């Protein structure tokens, strides 16, 4: 009997502790929601200043073991031409189970102590009425989130399948799974999204996207800019009957990486395509990478802030036209662009490639810029040579176009345009021969190992063009790039007339002098 009383006492004590902890947690949750909304609004204004979006929490009702709240996404007052009408908003209804052991988690046998477990879904209101008609009265998504005592939020979101037809258009979406992990104050963000298929049909036109996979892992760096990795993979994109073309893109990948050191930011954006078919003709695969290095972190922060400020200012414009607003934003961008040249940034295309069954073409480009001089008033009046010496530290361009590869590409392009195989091959041979001869005529390209190539390097006022070294003034003169005052020094060149005969040879009439 005594042991039973002790057991009952322990249970009552635990229940009292749980009740007290849940009640206390409920009070902490209300504070946490207010802080989270404030942080979310700060990030919305930084990332999407032109939208005027703002998040609000309304109707918070706190109980002992659970609470209710509505989150409303709306727009600021005074915003013109907003997507959301004044007074309307996208409402999310949330039911919050208090910690330390939220009932919703206990039901799933998740016994990790947490501040709260939150179940959220969209509310059917006037703003979302069209969406709920499409989803047949169901919330487009439901979200289950776990809020830790450190303030981080881990969420699992289910986006439901959607299937509807209207005005001859059929829309089918398989649904999606989203997982996110957000730290306190959104300093660290990770996100994954997976979806199987989206199909849109209209008459004989079809658009299909298969196998979407997004993975993001970012953290806020020392310059208040997110650094980290983002990757998107799409298994296949199919377009049939659109503009009488059938297009298939396979293995589409897009990735970006931003990193930082004590003073600079460094970034790389890559695109790749495993396969491209047009009218069932396989054109091959390609890659494209853009790089940036030595971008002064503080300068990038100021540049971004200037753009955001201009965008926010344009939102409340009552009297200016959209063109005037856009012009003001563009002016803000270009007026602050010079600050990005601090620390001699480097930009590049490393590489751009395209590969088919006959070979692979590559383009590599890199430029190192100089910081602008203190007196910027003379920049607009600078002659070409002075501008190059002032702005560019060094630059390189390397192009390799294997002749069999570009011949195959040109043949396929002619086949797509309706030519038969023999005529397509003849036409392609003419095009490649003309490209080669024009490149030689104007000393732009050479032929090396059966590939048309360009090798250009510039540094400190000296240039090497396809193996020939020369000074910057000589290069500008020979290639017709000098100022008008120097035109008398440039040998006159007459462009050859195009020869459309089957021989593919180029006939040069009159005096044609190649630059020497």
Placement of each model-derived feature along the sequence:
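Glycine-rich, small/hydroxylated-residue low-complexity segments
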Residues: 8-9, 16-516
């Amino acid at each position: 009997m005594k042991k039973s009383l002790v057991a009952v006492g322990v249970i009552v004590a635990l229940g009292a502790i749980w009740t007290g902890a849940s009640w206390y947690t409920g009070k902490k949750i209300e504070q946490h929601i207010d802080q989270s909304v404030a942080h979310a609004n700060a990030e919305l204004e930084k990332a999407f200043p032109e939208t005027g979006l703002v998040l609000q929490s309304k109707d918070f009702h706190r109980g002992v073991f659970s609470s209710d709240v509505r989150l409303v996404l709306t727009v600021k007052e005074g915003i013109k031409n907003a997507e959301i009408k004044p007074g309307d908003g996208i409402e999310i209804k949330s039911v919050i189970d208090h910690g330390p052991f939220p009932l919703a988690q206990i039901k799933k046998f998740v016994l990790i102590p947490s501040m709260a477990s939150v179940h959220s879904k969209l509310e059917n209101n006037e703003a979302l009425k069209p969406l709920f008609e499409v989803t047949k009265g169901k919330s487009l998504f439901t979200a289950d989130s776990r809020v830790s005592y450190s303030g981080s939020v881990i969420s699992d979101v289910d986006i439901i399948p959607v299937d509807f037809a209207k005005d001859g258009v059929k829309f089918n979406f398989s649904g999606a799974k989203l997982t996110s992990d957000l730290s306190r104050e959104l300093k660290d963000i990770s996100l994954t999204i997976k979806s199987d298929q989206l199909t849109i049909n209209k008459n004989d036109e079809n658009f299909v996207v298969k196998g979407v996979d997004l993975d993001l892992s970012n953290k806020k760096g020392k310059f208040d800019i997110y650094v980290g990795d983002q990757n998107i993979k799409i298994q296949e994109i199919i377009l049939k009957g659109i503009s009488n073309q059938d297009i298939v893109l396979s293995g589409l990948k897009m990735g970006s990486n931003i990193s930082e050191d004590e003073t600079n930011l460094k970034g790389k954006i890559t695109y790749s395509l495993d396969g491209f078919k047009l009218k069932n003709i396989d054109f091959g695969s390609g890659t494209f990478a853009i790089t940036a290095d030595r971008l002064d972190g503080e300068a990038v922060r100021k540049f971004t802030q200037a753009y955001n400020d201009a965008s926010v200012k344009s939102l409340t414009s009552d009297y200016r036209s959209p063109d005037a607003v856009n012009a003001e934003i563009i002016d803000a961008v270009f007026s602050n662009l010079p600050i990005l040249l601090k620390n001699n940034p480097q930009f590049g295309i490393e590489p751009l490639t395209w590969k088919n069954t006959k070979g692979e073409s590559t383009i590599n480009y890199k430029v190192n810029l100089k910081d602008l001089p203190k007196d910027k008033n003379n920049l607009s009046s600078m002659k070409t040579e002075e501008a190059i010496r002032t702005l560019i530290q060094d630059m390189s361009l390397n192009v390799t176009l294997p002749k069999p590869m570009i011949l195959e590409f040109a043949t396929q392009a002619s086949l797509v345009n309706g030519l038969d195989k023999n005529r397509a091959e003849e036409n392609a041979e003419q095009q490649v021969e003309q490209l080669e001869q024009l490149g030689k005529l104007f000393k732009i390209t050479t032929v090396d190992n059966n590939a048309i190539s360009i090798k250009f390097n510039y540094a400190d006022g000296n240039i090497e063009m396809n193996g020939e070294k020369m000074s910057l003034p000589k290069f500008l003169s020979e290639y017709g790039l000098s100022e008008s005052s120097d035109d008398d020094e440039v040998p006159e060149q007459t462009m050859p007339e195009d020869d459309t005969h089957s021989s593919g040879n180029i006939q040069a009439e009159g005096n044609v002098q190649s630059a020497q």
